[in-house]
Design a protein with these regions (language model features):
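Positively charged n-region of N-terminal signal peptides that target proteins for export
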Residues: 1-5
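Bacterial N-terminal signal peptides
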Residues: 6-16
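Short, well-ordered beta-strand segments enriched in hydrophobic/aromatic residues
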Residues: 145-153
C-alpha cells in the first residue's frame, strides 16, 4: 500500500485539477505580472494571478497550477518566471478595477492582507480609506470565477468594475448586500 502523502502527490501530478484546497504562491510570474503578485489555485483547476498593487486580477488560467522550478532554481542560478501549467483564458488590465461613486478617477488603493477559505481566498484592501473584502471562488462548473466585494462603508454608493478596453460595469448586490461580479471566459456557459 502506498503511504498517504506520496499517493496525494502522485494523484496531484497526474490529475492537477483534482485539488481540494486553495493554494497560494508569491513568486515571479509570467505574462507581465507585477512583482509581488499572488498566484492562486482554486479547487477544480481554476488558477489566477492577483495583483495587490492594483487590487485586481491580472489573468486567469485553467488546468495545472505552476511549474516552480524556474523561479526556485537553487543557489547561484538565474531566476526566471514560474511556468503556467495551462492556457490563459481571461485577462484584466487597468488600475484599481473596483470603483465607488463614479467610474473615474482611480481611487487610492492600499492592500492590507488575505485569508484562505475552504474553497476561496479573501483579499483585503482599502479604496480611498474604505475597507473592502474581496472573495474569489471558482464556479462549480470550473468555467468562471465569482468575485464578492464587501465594502465596510458606502452602502448607498454605486459601485463599478472598470477594466481597460471595456465599458464600466455597474455591480449588483446579492441578498446579503455583497457586490457580485461573475467572470467567465470564452466557451463558458
Amino acid at each position: 500500500m502506498i503511504p498517504r502523502a506520496p499517493l496525494v502527490l502522485l494523484l496531484t501530478l497526474l490529475f492537477p485539477t483534482l485539488r481540494a484546497e486553495v493554494r497560494v504562491e508569491r513568486v515571479l510570474l509570467p505574462e507581465g505580472a507585477t512583482p509581488g503578485s499572488f498566484a492562486v489555485a482554486l479547487p477544480g483547476g481554476v488558477n489566477f494571478c492577483y495583483d495587490p498593487a492594483r487590487g485586481g486580477l491580472s489573468y486567469v488560467w485553467t488546468g495545472g497550477f505552476l511549474d516552480l522550478a524556474p523561479a526556485r532554481p537553487g543557489p547561484g542560478k538565474f531566476i526566471a518566471p514560474a511556468r503556467l501549467l495551462g492556457p490563459v483564458v481571461h485577462r484584466e488590465e487597468g488600475p484599481a478595477p473596483l470603483r465607488r461613486g463614479q467610474p473615474a478617477p482611480a481611487p487610492a488603493l492600499t492592500f492590507t492582507g488575505y485569508t484562505l477559505r475552504p474553497a476561496a481566498i479573501e483579499f483585503r484592501y482599502t479604496l480611498d480609506g474604505v475597507p473592502v473584502r474581496e472573495e474569489l471562488s471558482a464556479r462549480p462548473d470550473g468555467r468562471g470565477l465569482e468575485r464578492r466585494f464587501v465594502p465596510a462603508g458606502g452602502g448607498d454608493a454605486r459601485w463599478w468594475h472598470i477594466t481597460e478596453g471595456r465599458p464600466p460595469a455597474a455591480l449588483g448586490r446579492d441578498a446579503a448586500g455583497a457586490l457580485i461580479l461573475e467572470v467567465s471566459w470564452e466557451g463558458a456557459p
